Amino acid sequence: MKLNYKGKSAVITGASGGMGLEISKKLSQNNISVLMLDLKNPGNEFLNKYKNCEFKKVNVTNFKSLKLHIEAFNKKHKSIDYLVNTTGV
């Protein structure tokens, strides 16, 4: 089922593989802007297909770097509506 959540945004940790990648895909398909945080890039093919996904390479144990990326995303989208933590899952 495809819904329209245009204007909503999500931050996903561990977003480049397994469950995180699938969640990123589903949220993107429902018009949610997604900040994908991971050490591994999901690849240009994925990012070109899911245009409202934005990838940032970050180690989630580095709080300063994590905060920097999340604050920039929040400023751009005015809010963060969803947080999905899949790092290490």
Q: What is the predicted role of each segment?
A:
Residues 72-85:
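A glycine-rich helix->loop->beta "capping" turn
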Residues 87-89:
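Conserved NAD(P)H cofactor-binding loop of Rossmann-fold oxidoreductase domains
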Residues 27:
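Aromatic pocket-lining residues of Rossmann-like dinucleotide-binding sites
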Residues 30-46:
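Conserved glycine-rich Rossmann-like NAD(P)H-binding loop of the short-chain dehydrogenase/reductase
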Residues 1-8:
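Flexible N-terminal pre-Rossmann segment of NAD(P)-dependent oxidoreductases
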Residues 9, 16-17:
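Conserved glycine-rich cofactor-binding loop
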Residues 20-21:
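N-terminal Rossmann-fold NAD(P) dinucleotide-binding loop
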Residues 57-69:
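The beta1-alpha1 cofactor-binding region of Rossmann-like NAD(H)/NADP(H)-dependent oxidoreductases
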